[in-house]
Amino acid sequence: MPEPTQKPAKEPVRAPIKEHFQLRETIVTIAADDPAHIEAAKEAIRVHRATLETYILADPYFQFTLEPYECPENAPEVVRRMVKAGNTMGIGPMSAVAGTISALAVEAMVKAGAKYAIVDNGGDIALINDRSVVVGIYAGQSPIKNLGLIFEPRDSITGVCTSAGTVGPSISFGMADAAAIFSDDVSLADAAATALGNEVGIGKEAVEVAFKVVKTVQGIKGALVIQGEYIGMWGKVPKITRAEVRHEYITKA
């Protein structure tokens, strides 16, 4: 009589390695399964940040303009991505700096073999994940707290970038406690989050009207806004769940 077959036990999913990394104003949290993948991200950040600094030394206007900017065709990759994203949204290229650095870092991790890689650059996040990931949205003093978004497993890079007029040091001309954009173009997500945040006033109607700035932009999957006691969503937004979101968890870039 044959022995009954037994299914092999599933190996437990190990917790990812997390590391905080700071290079001058760039402060990131990196998550991966392999220390080598984290090192790949750190090296990419060093290289692309140095390239960006060199470009800004040659043209300081790039850093300070809040308007669309034209760059030469032979400009560095980091510059071209930022310019394209900012111009798409009708704002300056620095609106996309954090998301662009995050994306370039995750791309380097993927080249190093990563199937699970997350870089959080001050709330501007690039990720690729072979298992579900919950990303928390921090909305400052809003009563809408402990909000998480479930990113299902995927084999390509995507992004979620957040801007706020009431939280953090970044420039915003609006009153959003959180304005988040979902896009596979992480540079675009960053610039669009800035543009969306700029549009948010106070109250329910102000939240509803703000989405007009992103509704017609190709490449944007969805958007979410929290303003005080109000929350609004447009397009395709990841499934919402409860998540423990504390201020000290936020990468302060």
From Swiss-Prot:
Annotated coiled-coil segments of the chain: none
InterPro entries to which the protein is assigned, alphabetical: ApbE-like_sf, MA1715-like, UPF0280
Source organism, top-level taxon: Archaea
UniProt record similarity statement: Belongs to the UPF0280 family.
Protein name, per record: UPF0280 protein MA_1715
